[in-house]
């Protein structure tokens, strides 16, 4: 029930943000180490200080999500050891420290358990298993202690846990929140952080270097704050549910993002909504989803393909890009690339959009500019140019089903 309430809150927020575009349609596990350390504790009530947030984002983030410190007065203190897993089976706050090899922090608690892990200068290096593995809980908080630096590394190929493909340094089957006042460094031969439900980030400094998706979730990714640096061969933020294309949303209300990605900087299946934050994205495609809404933020995109791309990936949303505010600077590479590419509608009601490239905009449906400033190759234009007339970008690539590509026009007229 708690997870359903959280999902409803996110859906309500996204529905409000997407008003300009109407919808198109209304375990068992194996412990890999030779020995195990088990920690149990009765639930302790954390002191919570409410953070300033907008009325909309408050429906997504709870007070505890946004609180960057934990009440450790009744916390269980644990020290890591080589070759030993630390298994948490009950709700509560756990302060973990130490350096270890081939050791995992495992959460396997009751369905209603809320577990808070406080990392205090932790260093874990594993060859084939997650450093933090959430098997079962209601929600898990991973909090970096103030002034701490924590490093989690997986150096080899991940080994499955039974039927579960554990392919990330932090791997969670349930809801997970990352926050705190310290630093978290993640290095992975696959994904960085993977959540099979919802992932929330509300604070801390997070550095991810990986070969696959840096942060991926089945249902949603929500970010309120934090300093996030990503270097990946695939996507920076990726939300997709292989079994349900009505899931896979991304909501960002703040934070600083420096993303270098081989594929997409930010990719959602259903929606991407940006209400704030500072973004520097260098990637093939900058921001991609079925339905994209930008209300505020400072966004700089350098893309070898499209800067912002809306293409049909979900039956739950209409294909649309809406820009209501913010400062956007988009630079594209040479070739069949577009600054803003919508396989549906495009609306600009506010903000400043500065596009440098061969084609500024490409849209298949309706385009309306009722406000804001649009600059194309140094010249301000009151109309939205269109370089349609050909193949259109899809999720993860360009061109139609026959491989035909669009023409190369699209300067303001």
Annotate each language-model stretch with its function.
Residues 2-413:
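A composition-driven surface/loop motif
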């Amino acid at each position: 029930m708690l997870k359903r309430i959280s999902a409803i809150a996110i859906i309500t927020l996204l529905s409000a943000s997407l008003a300009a575009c109407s919808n198109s349609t209304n375990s068992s596990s194996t412990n890999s180490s030779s020995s195990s350390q088990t920690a149990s504790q009765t639930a302790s009530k954390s002191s919570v200080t409410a953070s300033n947030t907008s009325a909309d984002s408050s429906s997504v983030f709870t007070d505890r999500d946004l609180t960057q410190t934990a009440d450790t007065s009744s916390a269980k203190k644990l020290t890591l050891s080589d070759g030993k897993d630390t298994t948490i089976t009950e709700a509560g706050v756990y302060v973990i420290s130490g350096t270890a090899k081939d050791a995992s922090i495992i959460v396997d608690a009751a369905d209603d358990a809320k577990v808070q892990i406080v990392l205090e200068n932790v260093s874990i290096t594993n060859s084939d298993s997650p450093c933090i593995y959430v098997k079962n809980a209601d929600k898990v908080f991973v909090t970096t202690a103030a002034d701490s630096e924590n490093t989690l590394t997986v150096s080899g190929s991940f080994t499955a846990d039974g039927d579960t493909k554990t392919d990330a340094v932090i791997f969670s089957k349930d809801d997970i929140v990352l926050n705190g006042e310290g630093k978290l460094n993640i290095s992975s031969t696959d994904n960085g952080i993977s959540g099979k439900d919802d992932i929330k980030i509300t604070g801390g400094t997070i550095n991810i270097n990986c070969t696959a998706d840096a942060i991926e979730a089945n249902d949603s990714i929500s970010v309120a704050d934090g300093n996030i640096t990503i270097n990946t061969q695939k996507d920076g933020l990726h939300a997709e549910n292989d079994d349900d294309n009505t899931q896979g949303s991304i909501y960002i209300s703040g934070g600083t993002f420096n993303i270098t990605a081989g594929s997409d900087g930010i990719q959602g299946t259903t929606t991407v909504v940006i209400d704030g934050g500072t973004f520097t994205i260098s990637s093939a495609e900058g921001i991609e989803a079925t339905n994209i809404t930008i209300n505020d933020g400072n966004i700089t995109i350098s893309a070898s393909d499209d800067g912002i791309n809306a293409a049909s990936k979900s039956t739950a949303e209409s294909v649309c890009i809406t820009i209501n505010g913010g400062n956007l600077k988009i630079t594209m590479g040479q070739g069949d690339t577009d600054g803003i590419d919508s396989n549906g509608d495009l609306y600009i009601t506010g903000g400043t959009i500065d596009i440098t490239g061969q084609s500024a905009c490409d849209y298949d449906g309706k385009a309306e500019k009722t406000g804001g400033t649009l600059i194309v190759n140094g010249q301000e234009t009151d109309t939205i140019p269109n370089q349609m007339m050909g193949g259109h970008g899809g999720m993860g690539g360009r061109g139609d089903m026959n491989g035909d590509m669009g023409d190369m026009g699209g300067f303001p007229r």
